[in-house]
């Protein structure tokens, strides 16, 4: 999901998203180098007046085009596998959030506190404030502390949904009857937008996600106000 005047990925707001961006750039560099090499070989082929005596059989070139791609694939596979394991790791979360997908809104529960749960609906365009984002703003934002390890549990009440925040590098399927989990670490304050990323019916495009990342002391005050209300 792109942001204003952005031709690439969103600015990362978590260490895992930074790693994903580094891997994207790493893989893209390899692809560019392969494209340049193949383009150069094809270009030179048109202007080559030499005749290859080993056109039908050449052991050296066959070894090269077998071993070289295998080495290149290793350079892509190793960082990819490392990232896959990092994304699956849960490191002593400070707080657990449960997200339930419905047609077509999200419900949230703060599992560490009693009776803190709410539904989050998209704000219709005709009710949107001047500084709001069309199809992205919600009536109830998720408030989470920055610089804290956060675990999220995702499920669904009806059909398959997908809870996604691109700036955090998080995408978790919400499957009815199952609990999927992942973790993330927000390293800066701000608003982070996402959307359901699994086609779930007529209003699939109208169930956005908004996270408000705040310092821990502001989060504690917010929790206290919710408990007392």
From Swiss-Prot:
Keywords: Copper, Electron transport, Magnesium, Membrane, Metal-binding, Mitochondrion, Mitochondrion inner membrane, Respiratory chain, Translocase, Transmembrane, Transmembrane helix, Transport. Residues 49-62 are mitochondrial matrix. GO terms for cellular component: mitochondrial inner membrane. PROSITE patterns: COX2, COX2_CUA, COX2_TM. It is a multi-pass membrane protein. Its cofactor is Cu cation. It is found in: Mitochondrion inner membrane. Mg(2+) binds at residue 198. Belongs to the cytochrome c oxidase subunit 2 family. Component of the cytochrome c oxidase (complex IV, CIV), a multisubunit enzyme composed of a catalytic core of 3 subunits and several supernumerary subunits. The complex exists as a monomer or a dimer and forms supercomplexes (SCs) in the inner mitochondrial membrane with ubiquinol-cytochrome c oxidoreductase (cytochrome b-c1 complex, complex III, CIII). NCBIfam families: CoxB. Component of the cytochrome c oxidase, the last enzyme in the mitochondrial electron transport chain which drives oxidative phosphorylation. The respiratory chain contains 3 multisubunit complexes succinate dehydrogenase (complex II, CII), ubiquinol-cytochrome c oxidoreductase (cytochrome b-c1 complex, complex III, CIII) and cytochrome c oxidase (complex IV, CIV), that cooperate to transfer electrons derived from NADH and succinate to molecular oxygen, creating an electrochemical gradient over the inner membrane that drives transmembrane transport and the ATP synthase. This is Cytochrome c oxidase subunit 2. The gene is mt:CoII.
């Amino acid at each position: 999901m792109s942001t204003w005047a952005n031709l690439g990925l969103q600015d990362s707001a978590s260490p895992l998203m930074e790693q994903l961006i580094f891997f994207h750039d790493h893989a893209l560099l390899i692809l560019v180098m392969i494209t340049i090499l193949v383009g150069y070989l094809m270009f030179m082929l048109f202007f080559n007046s030499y005749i290859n005596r080993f056109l039908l059989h050449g052991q050296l070139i066959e070894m090269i085009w077998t071993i070289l791609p295998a080495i290149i694939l290793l350079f892509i596979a190793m960082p990819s596998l490392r990232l896959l394991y990092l994304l699956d790791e849960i490191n002593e979360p400070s707080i657990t959030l449960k997200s339930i997908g419905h047609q077509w809104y999200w419900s949230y529960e703060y599992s560490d506190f009693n009776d803190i749960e709410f539904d989050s609906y998209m704000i219709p365009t005709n009710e949107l404030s001047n500084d709001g984002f069309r199809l992205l703003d919600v009536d109830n934002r998720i408030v989470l502390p920055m610089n804290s390890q956060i675990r999220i549990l995702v499920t669904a009440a009806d059909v398959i949904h997908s809870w996604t925040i691109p700036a955090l590098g998080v995408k978790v399927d919400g499957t009815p009857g199952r609990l999927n989990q992942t973790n993330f670490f927000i390293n800066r304050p701000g608003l982070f937008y996402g959307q359901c990323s699994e086609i779930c019916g007529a209003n699939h495009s109208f169930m956005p996600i908004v996270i408000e990342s705040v310092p821990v002391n502001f989060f504690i005050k917010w929790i206290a106000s919710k408990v007392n209300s």
